[in-house]
Design a protein with these regions (language model features):
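Membrane-proximal helix-loop-helix units in multi-pass membrane proteins
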Residues: 70-120
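Hydrophobic cores of alpha-helical transmembrane segments in multi-pass inner/ER membrane proteins
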Residues: 53-64, 100-110, 148-161
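N-terminal topogenic module of multi-pass integral membrane proteins
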Residues: 1-66
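Juxtamembrane "helix-exit" motif on the non-cytosolic side of transmembrane helices
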Residues: 32-36, 81-89, 129-138
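Membrane-interfacial loop-to-transmembrane-helix junctions in polytopic alpha-helical membrane proteins
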Residues: 8-15, 48, 85-93, 138-141
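Hydrophobic residues within membrane-embedded alpha-helical segments of Major Facilitator Superfamily
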Residues: 19, 26, 58, 65, ...
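Physicochemical signature of membrane-embedded alpha-helices that form the seven-helix bundle of GPCRs
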Residues: 16-19, 52-55, 71, 93-103, ...
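Terminal transmembrane helical module of multi-pass membrane proteins
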Residues: 116-161
Length: 161
């Protein structure tokens, strides 16, 4: 009886989306802490087995989000495509793919008319951009901004499904 109530209150696509997004956040963050890295990008490109794992994970998340009509899925697919493991893709990974996620999320916010969500996303995006460009914040700040951006974006997506 309780199981039926949970599925009525939370649709299956909301449960699946939250499992995928927060599964990625928790897996990446724990992997990051265990290996002493400073950002999600650095842990994703650490070795070939991680490249395969995170690429597959990001492709699943991106396709799932696109299937559920979320443009931010394009950004996840870009992150999967341009892995930071390959040195020729590092700048594309750091700039194009990260920006694609923010643009996709901003488009999703505008389409769903939830403008108050733009404020924290813009703040986190600007701080992450500054952290990438300067050594002023250090790379720990880049990792913290990646974590914050992923959490804020994931909460927005899950709340509005």
């Amino acid at each position: 009886m309780e199981n039926n109530t949970i599925l009525k209150k939370y649709p299956m696509n909301k449960i699946m989306t939250s499992m995928l997004l927060f599964g990625f956040i928790i897996t990446g963050f724990s992997d990051l802490l265990l290996h002493g890295k400073m950002s999600y990008s650095s842990i994703m490109g650490m070795n070939t087995s991680r490249v395969y794992f995170y690429t597959f994970f990001l492709l699943i998340i991106g396709c799932w989000l696109l299937y559920n009509k979320w443009f931010v899925g394009i950004g996840f697919i870009c992150l999967a495509t341009f892995s930071s493991y390959f040195t020729e893709y590092v700048s594309i990974h750091n700039y194009f793919a990260s920006i694609a996620i923010y643009f996709g999320l901003i488009i999703d916010v505008i389409i769903r008319k939830k403008m108050k969500w733009l404020i924290p996303l813009i703040i986190v995006g600007l701080l992450q951009g500054i952290a990438f460009q300067t050594g002023w914040f250090g790379y720990y700040m880049v990792g913290f901004m990646e974590f914050s951006g992923l959490c804020i974006g994931s909460i927005f997506i899950i709340k509005t499904i």
